[in-house]
Amino acid sequence: SVSRGLGDVYKRQKYTKENIIKYLKNPETNAKQLRNASIYLYEVSSQYRRVVNYFAHMCPLNYIMYPFKFDATKEINDKAFKASYKKATDFMSIFNLRHEMRKALTIAWREDIFAGYIYQTKDSFYIRKLPADYVKIASIVDGCYIVAFDFSYFRGKEDELESYGQEFIDKYEIYKKDSSQRWQLLDEKKQFCLKISEDVTYPLIPLAGCLVGIYDIEDYKDLQKGASILRNYKALGLKLPTDETGNLLIDKTLADQFYAQLTNITPDNIGVFETPMDVQVFDFEKSGAEDPDKTYEAIRNFYNDVGVSSLLFGSDKQTAASLNISITADECLTFAVNRQIERNVNRLLKNLSGTQKFQITILDISEYHRQQFHDLLLKDAQYGVPVKSAIAASVGIDQPAMNAMLFMENDFLKMHEKMIPLSSSYTLASGDEAGRPTAEENGEEISDSNENTREHDSNASR
C-alpha cells in the first residue's frame, strides 16, 4: 500500500486503494463513497484533475439559435417575431452559457450528476450547485432530468435557508410539519441537471475505472524513490587484521580513531563500519535495459484505464493519426453531453413568453478540431448552405453578440466605409486594367517595335 507522499493523505482521509477496489465491486451501493473519493482525488491528483478537465473543457460550447417548429408556409408577423427573438437572445446573453456550463461540466465529469437551481433576475443568471448527498433524480421532463431535494439538509442549518430562496423556505416548512415530506420535487422551471452516465439510473463516476491507477502511480513513485536512494548509497568496510586465532593485530582504540576520522569526512549517503571478516557485496540494481521506468508505465496505464491517449498529457509515443482517432472518440462522448445541455436550455427557452419560440443547437466543435470545422463551414457557404451564424459561432461569436457587432460595425461605426484595404489583386475590380506599368508611366521612350505592337494590338491573342 501507499506509505509516503499522497499515500499518507489518502489513508488519513480513509480512501485507500483497498477501499476503492471494494467500492467498485458494488458501485450502486457505494455511490456516495465513490463520489467523495472522486472529489478528493480531483483535488490531490494532478493526473486525475487533468483528465476530468480534459473532458469537461473539450468543447467551447458554441451555439446557433433558430425558430422552434417554424412554419414558412404561414404568414409571419414580423413585429411579433422580432419581439420573440429579442427575448430569446436577451435570455442567452444573461445565461452566459459557456461560463455556467464549464462549471457544471467539471462537476458532472467528476461526480456524474450536476444538479443546480436557477436564480435569475432581469440582468443576471446563476446556477447554484445543490449538495450532491441531498438530491436524487426523480423524473424526466422534456428529456431532461428532474431532481427531488432532501429537506433534512436544513436541520441545524436554518441560517442558510434565506440564501436558497422562497421555494426552499416554503418546502422546508412543509417538511417540519410532516417528516414524510423529506424528499420534495423542486420547480422544474428552475432546475438544471446533467448526468454523464445516462445508461444507468444511479450515480456512477464516469472515470471510476481509473481511480485505482492513481494509487499505483504513487506506489511506483515511492518504489522508484527508494530504489534511487539505494543506488546512491555506499558502504565502506574497514577490515581489521587478525591472526590465525582471530585476535586483532592492531589496537582496537587505534582502529576506532581511524574509523572516527573516516566517518567525519564521508557524506550522509556513505556508511562506514568495522569488521574482522571479509565483506561480500550484493548488488540489487538492475541494468537500464532490464529496469523500465515503472512510474512512467503506471501513468501510461492510468490514461489507458481512462480510455484517452497519454500523448495528450506529455507521455507515450504515438503517431499523429492514432492521436487524432483517440481525440475523435473522446469528442463523441462530450458531444453526447452537449445534447443534454441543449435540451435543458431549450426547455427554458420554451418557457419564455412570445408567439414564436426559439431553440439552440450546440455545434459539434472541440478545441482540438475547431479550425477544421470552421473551414468546413466556409466550404458549405460557397454552395449556399445557410451557415453564416454557424461560421460566426465557430469563432466564438454567438448570436446575441453577432447582432450587436453587426450594428456596431456596419450601422454605427460604418467600418465598411472607413476601413479601406490597400489595392491588390484581391481588391481590384474585374474591370480594372491589369499588367505592368506602361513605358510612359515609367518616363521611358516607346521603341518602334512597341509602337507597332500597340497599333496592331498584337498582344491581344496572347
Region spans (language model):
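Single conserved hydrophobic/aromatic residue that forms the stacking wall/gate
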Residues: 1-10
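Conserved aromatic-histidine-acidic binding/catalytic patches
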Residues: 12, 22-25, 29-32, 36, ...
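Generic structural signal for hydrophobic core residues of well-folded globular domains
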Residues: 27, 55-68, 95, 108, ...
